[in-house]
UniProtKB/Swiss-Prot annotation:
Coiled-coil spans in chain: none
Highest taxon, organism lineage: Bacteria
One term of GO molecular function: structural constituent of ribosome
Descriptive protein name: Large ribosomal subunit protein bL32
Keyword Phosphoprotein: no
One CC-aspect GO term: large ribosomal subunit
Length: 59
């Protein structure tokens, strides 16, 4: 188990933690139904991925 040998200052700790930020999920418009969807995912509203129907939604 790692144990600190020397105390780290607040500025060093804060510099290290500076990259710990969350990014909001990016949404794109589905080319089939024009609703927002996550990139590289099947559209949850129409079931299309890369202009092919992957999941039949059964309207």
């Amino acid at each position: 188990m790692g144990v600190a040998q020397h105390r780290q200052s607040k500025s060093r700790v804060r510099k290290r933690r500076a990259m710990w930020k969350l990014t909001a999920p990016n949404h794109i418009e589905c080319p089939q139904c024009h609703k927002p969807k996550m990139p590289h995912h099947v559209c949850p509203s129409c079931g299309y991925y890369k202009a092919k129907e992957v999941i039949s939604m059964g309207e």
